[in-house]
């Protein structure tokens, strides 16, 4: 093997994956696979120091600072940990520490799979939050951190300065909910909770952060001016008493055997935690011992991270089927011979699209390796060609829809295949279900089972049929397909009530690709009616906050379709409101052309309430401060947005000022 060539190759591969992981939040390989590449490079460099260079990935932290967020210098560099993968390496670490420190104790904690943040408190008040970035300079995410409920904004202790580190993460339950909503709007499906948590905390729109319910575990106290501690475990107890969620169920150990057993205990429980971990961290407990042990050029000598390999199993693809989504996307699904993986029975896994199937050479009958992405979603890692039976069949996504037999089309600039028939029964079922859902028209009692029953008996085939169900009241009661008379009356009353919804709910319910609740509210606040919105030009839409070159063409295509023109005509005939109540409520347009940014905690109003008031007078509410911002409405704990507004000379107003402005 050409050592120099392999080292150069590994550096390029690792730099590529560093960028995908740290800066794009879209890793292509598992942490375990990455760690193996990294260890190979590190070992080669150690064996051949003549090839070691300062710019190597082994000599620096992987990320760079995202351009859109304010840069903040770290008081203490945020460095990586030394990874270990075997029992022998763990014992070697403990023995080395024992040879340098008298009677050391070790703390073993779960290694949460999330995004590290540094929190700064001044006199008990949270004032700053910073991501790791490149280890020396991070990015301020203070406004977003305020949306994380498990982070105290005030603590009992009034230390002059407190700096702590924690891991932002998303529970498995919330991750599934977010992906379900993304599926409903035809948006991006996230690979795992870590990617989603990392991408969310870097959002420029705080409302998105609030909706996604992030959490945090605090794992280290860095600076505590005015208070001294002897051990790490003591700091965790103190932080817990201050209201922080600290690394859960950590163990204090004295021997290598105890440390190893603690690591095994964590591994055994990892599938029942409700959130993702990718290892266990072993730390020297005594803080003075940590100082004496010091660090290498890159990692602390007093700690290591033991990385668990992802649990993988072999199984067989017994068949491949296609499901049709609400937006018409054909989703190939592998039906697997059932296998127990991470304490659950796995019998299917998504194959995403034709490119995915082809790149992995996946065939019906293949034996495949599967694991859970982020410990949640089953994914096929690779097929095993040497175990392929002679009869194994290549799979091609059909050129006709499996539900309605209409022609399918491959998106010219994408990887998805879609059904060309907007009236496809599979699409109609999901479209109707989404239209009546809580996030859209909120028709109480109109669940998926009701949709299925009414479609099966031919009472509804498309969205507009919902509003003529009252014509079949007697038949519905007689047949009892959705319950007795009271149930029928309740449903019909709920349908009538929905006619009076504001148009943001109607826009949401239409299921336009890449348009969810937040986008629908912006549209309803900028167009006085559905007709005006349908006639909007590209130039008008692209100027709206958070509407980009991906979303706007989808909106234009939808409103120019014959299907929409027919649907809106029938909805109007049924009496469904198509006028923006948000704009109707305007007393005047005194804020027309003005852009407001709301930051901090207001004395009596919620931010959403303040935003509605501003919008009702013609103003626009933005999630970020720029030269185009007219006013910043600031409450308590106003952070980086207030600072930027002051630097730009933008007018700062209070809640009282806003009230005076609308008198």
Curated annotation (Swiss-Prot):
Gene3D superfamilies: 5' to 3' exonuclease, C-terminal subdomain (1.10.150.20), 6.20.10.30, BRCT domain (3.40.50.10190), DNA ligase/mRNA capping enzyme (3.30.470.30), Helix hairpin bin (1.10.287.610), Nucleic acid-binding proteins (2.40.50.140). NAD(+) binds at residues 31-35, 80-81, 109, 132, 167, 283, 307. It catalyses: NAD(+) + (deoxyribonucleotide)n-3'-hydroxyl + 5'-phospho-(deoxyribonucleotide)m = (deoxyribonucleotide)n+m + AMP + beta-nicotinamide D-nucleotide. One of its GO terms (biological process) is DNA replication. The keyword Phosphoprotein does not apply. The active site is at 111 (n6-amp-lysine intermediate). Keywords: DNA damage, DNA repair, DNA replication, Ligase, Magnesium, Manganese, Metal-binding, NAD, Zinc. The keyword Flavoprotein does not apply. SUPFAM superfamilies: BRCT domain (SSF52113), DNA ligase/mRNA capping enzyme, catalytic domain (SSF56091), Nucleic acid-binding proteins (SSF50249), RuvA domain 2-like (SSF47781). It comes from the Bacteria. InterPro entries: BRCT_dom, BRCT_dom_sf, DisA/LigA_HHH, DNA_ligase, DNAligase_adenylation, DNAligase_N, NA-bd_OB-fold, NAD_DNA_ligase_OB. It is an enzyme of class 6 (ligase). Its cofactor is Mg(2+); Mn(2+). Residues 586-663 form the BRCT domain. Its EC number is 6.5.1.2. GO terms for cellular component: cytosol. One of its GO terms (molecular function) is DNA ligase (NAD+) activity. CDD domains: LIGANc (cd00114). Belongs to the NAD-dependent DNA ligase family. LigA subfamily. PANTHER family: CHROMOSOME TRANSMISSION FIDELITY FACTOR 18, DNA LIGASE. NCBIfam families: dnlj (TIGR00575), PRK07956.1 (NF005932). DNA ligase that catalyzes the formation of phosphodiester linkages between 5'-phosphoryl and 3'-hydroxyl groups in double-stranded DNA using NAD as a coenzyme and as the energy source for the reaction. It is essential for DNA replication and repair of damaged DNA. This is DNA ligase. It comes from Clostridium kluyveri (strain ATCC 8527 / DSM 555 / NBRC 12016 / NCIMB 10680 / K1).
């Amino acid at each position: 093997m050409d050592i120099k060539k392999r080292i150069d190759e590994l550096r390029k591969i690792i730099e590529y994956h560093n960028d995908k992981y740290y800066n794009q939040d879209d890793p292509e390989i598992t942490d375990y696979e990455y760690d193996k590449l990294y260890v190979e490079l590190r070992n080669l460099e150690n064996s051949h120091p003549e090839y070691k260079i300062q710019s190597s990935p082994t000599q620096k932290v992987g990320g760079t600072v995202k351009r859109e967020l304010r840069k903040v210098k770290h008081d203490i560099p945020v460095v990586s940990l030394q990874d270990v993968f075997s029992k022998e390496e763990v014992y070697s670490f403990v023995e080395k520490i024992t040879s340098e420190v008298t009677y050391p104790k070790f703390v073993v904690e779960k290694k949460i799979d999330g995004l590290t943040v540094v929190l700064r408190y001044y006199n008990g008040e949270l004032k700053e939050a910073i991501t790791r970035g490149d280890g020396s300079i991070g990015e301020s995410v203070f406004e977003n951190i305020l949306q994380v409920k498990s982070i105290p904004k005030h603590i009992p202790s009034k230390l002059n300065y407190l700096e702590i580190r924690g891991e932002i993460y998303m529970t498995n339950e919330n991750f599934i909910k977010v992906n379900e909503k993304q599926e409903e709007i035809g948006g991006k499906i996230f690979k795992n909770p870590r990617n989603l948590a990392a991408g969310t905390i870097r959002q420029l729109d705080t409302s998105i952060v609030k909706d996604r319910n992030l959490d945090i575990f605090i794992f280290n106290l860095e600076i505590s001016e005015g208070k001294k501690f002897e051990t790490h475990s003591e700091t965790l107890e103190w932080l817990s008493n201050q209201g922080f969620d600290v690394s859960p169920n950590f163990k204090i150990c004295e021997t290598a055997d105890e440390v190893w057993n603690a690591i095994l205990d964590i591994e055994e429980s990892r599938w029942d935690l409700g959130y993702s971990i990718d290892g266990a961290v072993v730390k020297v407990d005594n803080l003075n011992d940590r100082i004496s042990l010091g660090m290498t050029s890159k990692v602390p000598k007093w700690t290591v991270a033991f990385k668990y390999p992802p649990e993988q199993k072999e199984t067989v693809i017994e068949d491949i089927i296609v499901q049709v989504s609400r937006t018409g996307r054909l989703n190939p699904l592998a039906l697997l011979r059932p296998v127990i993986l991470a304490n659950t029975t796995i019998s299917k896994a998504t194959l995403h699209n034709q490119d995915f199937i082809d790149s992995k050479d996946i065939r019906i009958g293949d034996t495949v390796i599967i694991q859970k992405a982020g410990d949640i979603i089953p994914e096929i890692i690779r097929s095993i060609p040497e175990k392929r039976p002679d009869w194994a069949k290549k799979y091609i996504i059909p050129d006709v829809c499996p539900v309605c037999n209409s022609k399918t089309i491959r998106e010219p600039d994408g990887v998805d295949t879609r059904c060309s028939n907007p009236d496809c029964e599979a699409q109609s079922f999901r479209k109707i279900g989404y239209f009546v859902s809580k996030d859209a028209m909120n028709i109480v009692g109109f669940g998926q089972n009701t949709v299925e029953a009414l479609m099966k008996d031919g009472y509804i085939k498309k969205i507009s049929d919902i509003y003529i169900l009252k014509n079949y009241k007697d038949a519905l009661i007689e047949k009892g397909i959705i319950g007795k008379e009271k149930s029928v009356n309740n449903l019909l009353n709920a349908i009538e009530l929905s006619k009076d919804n504001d148009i943001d709910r109607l826009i949401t319910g239409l299921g336009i690709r890449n348009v969810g609740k937040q986008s629908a509210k912006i549209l309803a606040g900028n167009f006085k009616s559905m007709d005006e919105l349908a006639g909007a030009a590209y130039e008008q839409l692209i100027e709206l906050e958070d509407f980009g070159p991906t979303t706007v063409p989808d909106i234009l295509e939808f409103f120019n379709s014959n299907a929409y023109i027919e649907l809106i005509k029938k909805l109007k005939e049924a009496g469904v409101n198509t006028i923006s109540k948000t704009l109707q409520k305007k007393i005047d347009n005194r804020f027309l052309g003005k852009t407001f940014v709301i930051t901090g905690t207001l004395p009596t109003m919620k931010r959403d309430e303040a935003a509605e008031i501003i919008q009702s007078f013609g103003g626009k509410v933005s999630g970020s401060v720029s030269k185009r911002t007219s006013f910043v409405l600031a409450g308590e704990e106003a952070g980086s947005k207030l600072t930027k507004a002051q630097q730009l000379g933008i007018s700062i107003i209070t809640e009282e000022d806003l009230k005076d402005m609308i008198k």
